[in-house]
């Protein structure tokens, strides 16, 4: 009997190691798939046939995004007609991809800035505040993962975000310091310390529920969420299989409508917020005892675009002042201020647009020979003060630079957000998923 128990224990350990082995070591390539891209119109629609060529490169596929029901505190589909068996059934179809790609680990994401939240009554905070509320969330999460064949769950917990910070010169910094004496600092969350402790409890309790089945538990630190406020790093890392640092969207036309600037630099720029870069975020987690092998750097597959005005000048050199909020969105993104990589690529100089004028004329591309901050492209306003645009974006080269940074630092890998904004049709150069391929090539 004793021998039998030992053998059963050894078998359980092997199964657990097998399921979690994809998050140990390095060169993780965690790919995000936004299920809503399946519902887009025309060429913007990412079908499962379009998705499949990417899966050979991904170590993980994160399907997003599930939501929290504020009444029951249960994990639920954000679109039942799309996700569940009563409709299109993408949950089961996506996890079924593992039969053809057995190396692939498929996880379900909750939150991820895709779940509707009342700013005055944030359900993600309310759930944390009660152990009785956490229980139905944990039970329903475990059930959903098991029912639909996912390999685990990723927490894209929607904590309150930092207040946007403006770029200040020397005089501006003096005035800001003087004003702060009287107004004080902006408080992101008055109960941040309590919520940090409660989130630690949630991670521990959730991992305890998932561990017997060997399920993976990941964390996505969403853009502009202050890690020092909400994450007790030493207390949670042992219960997490990986941490995706979404170190991008530091500057966006929604957060900073009057100032266009690099959204996702690797390193700090002069006279900018020292925290608004990849390296700062990585170093914070490393210094707080998160193993390097668990850290994955988030890389977006899109650009952020502002309208330039006559007062924005002619050079395009960031930060660009006197911007006028978000530029028009693309046919693919359908979101103001957001352009997918193929949408950006089509605006850069090419034979098809070299003779076009006005809003269709090509942008001027400015590369980054330092490999520290990123590319941008712009078109100053015309004589009528119209058609000005400034966009900073990720392309295969900048993504490869970040992958090289990850290798140099000995980190776990990269999280690409998301596949539907990479050039999945090969419209730009003929190569499908060029950003994904560039990252994978750098890891080889």
UniProtKB/Swiss-Prot annotation:
Show which residues constitute the signal peptide.
1-22
Glycan attachment residues as annotated in the record = 226
Q: Where is this protein found?
A: Secreted
Q: Where are the transmembrane segments?
A: none
Write out the entry's keywords from A to Z.
Developmental protein, Disulfide bond, Glycoprotein, Secreted, Signal
Identify the InterPro entries for this entry: Chitinase_II/V-like_cat, Chitinase_insertion_sf, Glyco_hydro18_cat, Glycoside_hydrolase_SF, Glycosyl_Hydrlase_18, IDGF
Q: Which domain of life is it from?
A: Eukaryota
GO BP term, pick one:
carbohydrate metabolic process
Q: What cystine pairs are annotated?
A: 31-58, 345-428
Modifications made to the protein after synthesis: Glycosylated.
Q: Where's it mainly located?
A: secreted
| Gene Ontology terms: cellular component | extracellular region
Q: Which residues form the GH18 domain?
A: 27-444
- What are this entry's molecular-function GO terms? chitin binding; chitinase activity
Q: According to its UniProt entry, what is the function of this protein?
A: Cooperates with insulin-like peptides to stimulate the proliferation, polarization and motility of imaginal disk cells. May act by stabilizing the binding of insulin-like peptides to its receptor through a simultaneous interaction with both molecules to form a multiprotein signaling complex.
Q: What else is known?
A: Lacks the typical Glu active site in position 158 that is replaced by a Gln residue, preventing the hydrolase activity. Its precise function remains unclear.
Question: What's the family?
Answer: Belongs to the glycosyl hydrolase 18 family. IDGF subfamily.
Full protein name: Chitinase-like protein Idgf4
Say which species the protein is native to.
Glossina morsitans morsitans
Q: What lineage does UniProt assign to this protein's organism?
A: Eukaryota, Metazoa, Ecdysozoa, Arthropoda, Hexapoda
């Amino acid at each position: 009997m004793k021998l039998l128990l030992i053998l059963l224990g050894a078998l359980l350990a092997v199964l657990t190691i097998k399921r979690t082995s994809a998050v140990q070591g390095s060169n993780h390539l965690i790919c995000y798939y936004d299920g809503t891209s399946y519902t887009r119109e025309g060429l913007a629609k990412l079908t499962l046939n379009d998705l499949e060529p990417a899966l050979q490169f991904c170590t993980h596929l994160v399907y997003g995004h599930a939501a929290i029901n504020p009444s029951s505190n249960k994990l639920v589909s954000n679109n039942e007609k799309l996700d569940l068996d009563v409709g299109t059934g993408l949950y089961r179809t996506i996890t079924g991809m593992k039969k053809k790609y057995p190396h692939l680990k498929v996880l379900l994401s909750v939150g991820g800035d895709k779940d509707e939240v009342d700013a005055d009554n944030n359900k993600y905070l309310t759930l944390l505040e009660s152990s009785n509320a956490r229980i139905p969330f944990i039970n329903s999460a475990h059930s959903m993962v098991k029912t639909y064949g996912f390999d685990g769950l990723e927490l894209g917990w929607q904590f309150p975000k930092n207040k946007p910070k403006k770029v200040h010169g020397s005089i501006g910094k003096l005035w800001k310091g003087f004003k702060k004496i009287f107004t004080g600092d902006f408080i992101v969350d008055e109960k941040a310390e309590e919520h940090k402790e409660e989130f630690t409890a949630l991670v521990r309790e959730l991992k305890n529920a998932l561990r017997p089945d060997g399920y993976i538990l990941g964390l996505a630190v969403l853009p502009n969420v202050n890690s020092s406020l909400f994450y007790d790093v030493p207390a949670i890392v042992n219960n997490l299989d990986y941490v995706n640092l979404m170190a991008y969207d530091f500057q966006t036309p929604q957060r900073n409508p009057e100032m266009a600037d690099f959204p996702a630099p690797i390193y700090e720029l002069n006279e900018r917020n020292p925290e608004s870069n990849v390296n700062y975020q990585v170093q914070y987690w490393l210094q707080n005892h998160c193993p390097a092998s668990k850290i994955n750097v988030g890389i977006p597959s899109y650009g952020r675009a502002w309208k330039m005005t006559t007062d924005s000048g002619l050079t395009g050199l960031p930060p660009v002042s006197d911007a006028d909020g978000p530029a028009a969105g693309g046919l693919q993104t359908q979101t103001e201020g957001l352009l997918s990589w193929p949408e950006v690529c089509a605006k850069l100089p090419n034979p098809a647009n070299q003779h076009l004028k006005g809003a269709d004329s090509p942008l001027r591309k400015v590369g980054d020979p330092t490999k520290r901050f990123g590319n941008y492209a712009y078109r100053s306003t015309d004589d009528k003060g119209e058609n000005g645009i400034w966009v900073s974006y990720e392309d295969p080269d900048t993504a490869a630079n970040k992958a090289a940074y990850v290798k140099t630092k000995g980190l776990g890998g990269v999280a690409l957000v998301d596949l539907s904004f990479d050039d999945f049709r090969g419209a730009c150069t003929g190569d499908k998923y060029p950003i994904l391929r560039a990252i994978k090539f750098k890891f080889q």
